[in-house]
Amino acid sequence: MEQYNEKIGTRKDLVSYRIETAKSDLKSAKILLNAGEYKGANNRAYYAIFHAINAVHALDGRAFKRHKDAIANFNKDYVKTEIFPREVGRKIGEAEEIRHASDYDDFYIASKEETERQIAVAGEFIELSLIHISEPTRPRLI
């Protein structure tokens, strides 16, 4: 029987909330792209990926406070074991680097093409996460 937490509901509720947050971030990234705000769009595309990663972790009852821990554990537990395609790990790392440059590098110039690519990666990752979450026979970590 699934546990219920007064603040967040069930684990399934938390997973759904995080996926919806990822989808909202992706929608925001697209709006920012269309407005020519490429740095902001890169930020939202990264966070779409990050929230989807956290949804996958929540599915197995896991949570991490720091971004690098969430990503490192995702790569260790889901990418290296080929639950998710190996190329996903590289794309997550690239999205993190671009987000970091977009947020903190004063001289970084984000291009429309690069931003479109990051948004596409975020969309693909959300779709992969949804497939994983909905698989009744998916591998369990716990």
Positions of PLM-derived features:
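Terminal alpha-helical segments
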Residues: M1-L130, S134
